[in-house]
C-alpha cells in the first residue's frame, strides 16, 4: 500500500496514529539536528520530521532529497509545537520512521509554488509541472465540480446528454473551420465542429426535446485572453419552448452554479437590456454593470459653439467618473494617450472637472460659456468632485466602442471592477443581420438558423436590416458567458433566410440540405443556448484568461509548446492523404 491517507487529510484527532503517505517533496529545511520536509500531493501539504538523534541514517537520507522527488514515508502523527494556521494540516506533523524514494527528479525550471517565478512560455512548455501548483490545480477542480453541478441540474429537469460527432461537414459561414483530410475519400475533408448547432436541431426533429452535451468545439480564429482554438460549451436545446422558457431555465442554472460553487445567493431576476440600449449607453453588447458611468450623448448641448472637433462630429458623448476630479494633468494625459492607442483609435479626449463650488472647469473652456458647461453638468447629474470625460467622432458606433474602452479603464483605475461582485444580465433583441464590408452583403449576426422576432418577419421583404432576432446573450461582469436563440423550424422561412444571406438555392441545399429536408418531416418549435464552460470557470476563479482553467491550453499563436503542435507530418502520411504542401510566400 503506497498510502493510508492523503497529504491534506490528517488532523489533530489523528495524533498517535501510524500512517503512510506518498507525494512530492515541496521544500526541505534543516534546523540543528532536525530536518523538516513539506510533502505535497493534490490534496494538501503535510510536514515531515526527521530527528538525527533518533535515526541519524534516516535523517542523512532525508537531507539528500531534492525538490520534487517522489517519496513514500511511514511514521506517527504528532501534535505540532509550532502550528501553521495557513494550512488545514497545520496542527500536526509526522515523525518519520521509514523513507522510500519512489523516484528522483531533476530540478524544475521554475518553483512549484502559488506565486511561481516561471513566465507564461516556460510554464506552458512544462505544463505538467505547472499543474502541480495549487493555484492551477484548484482551477481544474473547480471545473470538475462545475460539470458535476451542470449535469445534476439538467438531469433534474429531464435533459438527456447526447454525444454528437466531432468529424462533420464544413460550413464556411462564420469563423474558419479546422479541416481534417479523409484518407478513405481522397480529396475530401471533414471539419471539426464550431458548435453542434445543426446536429442538436436534428435531435429536436428526432423528438429528444431536452438535450445537452458538454461539447468540445473548434474555431480557427485569432486568439485573445478569452479565446482558444478548442474550447468547451455546455450545449443545450429544448423543443416546444419560447424565449421566456429558455431564459428561465438557464437563469436557473446560473443561479444554481453561483449558489453551489461560490456560495452566492442571487434572488432577484436578472436584468434584461435590449441590444440597442446596451450599445447606446455602454458601447458594448456585453456591458459590465458592476459600476455606473452610463454614456450621456451631448450633441444637442456641445455642438454649434465654434469647437470644430465637436461641431463636425457625428457623435459626442461622455462618462462621469464620480469623485475623480482630483486626477492630475499627468493622469489625464495618460488617459488621452490610452484612448489614442491604435487598437482604440480615438483622436483625443476632452475633460471637465466639477469644482467644489459647482462651477465646471474644462479643457475647452475658451469655446464654452459657464452656462453651457452647467447644462452639460446637469445632463450627467454630476456633483462637485466629479470628472467628466468626453469623446467624439464621425462614426457613431466606433466612437461608442472607444468610449466603452475608456469607461472600462476608468472602472479599473477606480477599483470598481471587483472580481468578487457579480452582476448578471440578459442582452436581448439583437439585430438579425449585420453588414459585412468585406463580403459586401448582409451576414447573420448570430447564425443563419436564428428565428426573427415574429412581429419583424414582414420586414424580411422590405427592410431586412431592421429585423430583430429572437436571440439572447447572458453577460456577467462584462463577459459573455452564453448565448442562444429560438431557431427557425419552418423549411420555407429557412430558405428565405438563406436567400437574404446571399445563398443560391443550390448552395443552401449543398451545405444545409440535410437540415432543410429534416424540417419537412415535422420539426417542432425549438431553441437553445450554449454556455462557455471555460469562461464560467475563469469568472468563478477570478482569472483574467481562460488558459489557466484548461489543462493543456494553446498559446496566443495557437501553438501547444509542450507537444510542439501543430507540426509537419512525414511524406508517407501526406501521400496516404493525397496531399501536397504548397506554402505561399508572403508578398
Swiss-Prot record:
One of its GO terms (cellular component) is cytoplasm. This is Aspartate--tRNA ligase. Its EC number is 6.1.1.12. Catalyzes the attachment of L-aspartate to tRNA(Asp) in a two-step reaction: L-aspartate is first activated by ATP to form Asp-AMP and then transferred to the acceptor end of tRNA(Asp). ATP binds at residues 219-221, 228, 480, 532-535. HAMAP family: Asp_tRNA_synth_type1. L-aspartate binds at residues 173, 219, 446, 487. SUPFAM superfamilies: Class II aaRS and biotin synthetases, GAD domain-like, Nucleic acid-binding proteins. It comes from Bacteroides thetaiotaomicron (strain ATCC 29148 / DSM 2079 / JCM 5827 / CCUG 10774 / NCTC 10582 / VPI-5482 / E50). It is an enzyme of class 6 (ligase). Keywords: Aminoacyl-tRNA synthetase, ATP-binding, Cytoplasm, Ligase, Nucleotide-binding, Protein biosynthesis. Residues 197-200 are annotated as: Aspartate. Belongs to the class-II aminoacyl-tRNA synthetase family. Type 1 subfamily.
Amino acid at each position: 500500500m503506497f498510502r493510508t491517507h492523503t497529504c491534506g487529510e490528517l488532523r489533530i484527532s489523528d495524533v498517535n496514529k501510524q500512517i503512510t503517505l506518498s507525494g512530492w517533496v515541496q521544500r526541505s529545511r534543516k534546523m540543528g539536528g532536525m530536518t523538516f520536509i513539506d510533502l505535497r500531493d493534490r490534496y494538501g501539504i503535510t510536514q515531515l520530521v526527521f530527528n538525527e538523534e533518533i535515526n541519524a541514517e534516516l535523517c542523512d537520507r532525508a537531507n539528500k532529497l531534492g525538490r520534487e522527488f517522489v517519496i513514500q514515508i511511514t511514521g506517527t502523527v504528532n501534535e505540532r509545537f509550532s502550528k501553521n494556521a495557513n494550512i488545514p494540516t497545520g496542527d500536526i506533523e509526522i515523525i518519520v520512521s521509514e523513507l522510500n524514494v519512489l523516484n528522483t527528479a531533476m530540478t524544475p525550471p521554475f518553483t512549484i509554488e502559488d506565486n511561481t517565478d516561471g513566465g507564461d512560455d516556460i510554464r506552458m512548455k512544462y505544463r505538467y509541472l505547472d499543474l502541480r501548483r495549487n493555484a492551477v490545480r484548484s482551477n481544474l477542480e473547480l471545473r470538475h465540480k462545475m460539470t458535476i453541478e451542470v449535469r445534476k441540474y439538467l438531469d433534474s429537469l429531464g435533459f438527456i446528454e447526447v454525444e454528437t460527432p466531432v468529424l462533420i461537414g464544413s460550413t464556411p459561414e462564420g469563423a474558419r473551420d479546422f479541416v481534417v483530410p479523409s484518407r478513405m475519400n481522397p480529396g475530401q475533408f471533414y471539419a471539426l465542429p464550431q458548435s453542434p448547432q445543426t446536429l442538436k436541431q436534428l435531435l429536436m426533429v428526432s423528438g429528444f426535446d431536452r438535450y445537452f452535451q458538454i461539447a468540445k468545439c473548434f474555431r480557427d480564429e485569432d486568439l485573445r485572453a478569452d479565446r482558444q482554438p478548442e474550447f468547451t460549451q455546455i450545449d443545450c436545446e429544448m423543443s416546444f419552448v419560447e424565449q421566456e422558457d429558455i431564459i428561465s431555465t438557464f437563469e436557473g442554472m446560473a443561479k444554481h452554479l453561483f449558489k453551489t460553487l461560490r456560495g452566492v445567493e442571487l434572488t432577484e431576476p436578472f436584468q434584461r437590456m435590449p441590444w440597442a440600449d446596451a450599445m447606446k449607453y455602454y458601447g458594448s453588447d456585453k456591458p459590465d454593470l458592476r459600476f455606473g458611468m452610463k454614456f450621456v450623448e451631448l450633441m444637442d448641448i456641445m455642438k454649434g459653439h465654434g469647437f470644430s472637433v465637436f461641431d463636425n462630429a457625428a457623435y459626442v458623448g461622455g462618462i462621469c467618473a464620480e469623485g475623480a476630479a482630483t486626477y492630475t494633468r499627468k493622469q489625464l494625459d495618460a488617459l488621452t494617450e490610452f484612448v489614442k492607442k491604435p487598437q482604440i483609435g480615438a483622436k483625443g479626449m476632452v475633460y471637465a472637472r466639477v469644482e467644489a463650488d459647482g462651477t465646471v472647469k474644462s479643457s475647452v473652456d475658451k469655446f464654452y460659456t459657464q452656462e453651457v458647461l452647467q447644462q452639460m453638468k446637469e445632463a450627467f447629474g454630476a456633483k462637485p468632485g466629479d470628472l467628466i470625460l468626453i469623446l467624439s467622432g464621425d462614426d457613431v458606433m466606433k466612437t461608442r466602442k472607444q468610449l466603452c474602452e475608456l469607461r472600462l479603464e476608468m472602472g479599473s483605475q477606480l477599483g470598481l471592477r471587483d472580481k468578487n461582485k457579480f452582476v448578471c444580465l440578459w442582452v436581448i433583441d439583437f439585430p438579425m443581420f449585420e453588414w459585412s464590408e468585406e463580403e459586401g452583403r448582409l451576414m447573420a449576426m448570430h447564425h443563419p438558423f436564428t428565428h426573427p422576432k415574429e412581429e419583424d418577419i414582414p420586414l424580411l421583404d422590405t427592410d431586412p436590416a431592421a429585423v430583430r432576432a429572437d436571440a439572447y446573450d447572458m453577460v456577467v461582469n462584462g463577459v459573455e458567458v452564453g448565448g442562444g436563440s429560438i431557431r427557425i423550424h419552418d423549411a420555407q422561412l429557412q430558405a428565405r433566410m438563406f436567400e437574404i444571406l446571399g445563398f443560391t438555392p443550390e448552395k443552401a441545399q449543398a451545405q444545409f440540405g440535410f437540415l432543410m429536408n429534416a424540417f419537412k418531416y415535422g420539426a417542432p418549435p425549438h431553441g437553445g443556448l450554449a454556455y462557455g464552460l471555460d469562461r464560467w470557470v475563469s469568472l468563478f476563479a477570478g482569472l483574467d484568461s481562460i488558459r489557466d482553467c484548461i489543462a493543456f491550453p494553446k498559446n496566443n499563436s495557437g501553438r501547444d509548446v509542450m507537444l510542439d503542435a501543430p507540426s509537419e507530418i512525414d511524406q508517407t502520411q501526406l501521400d496516404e492523404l493525397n496531399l501536397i504542401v504548397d506554402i505561399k510566400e508572403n508578398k
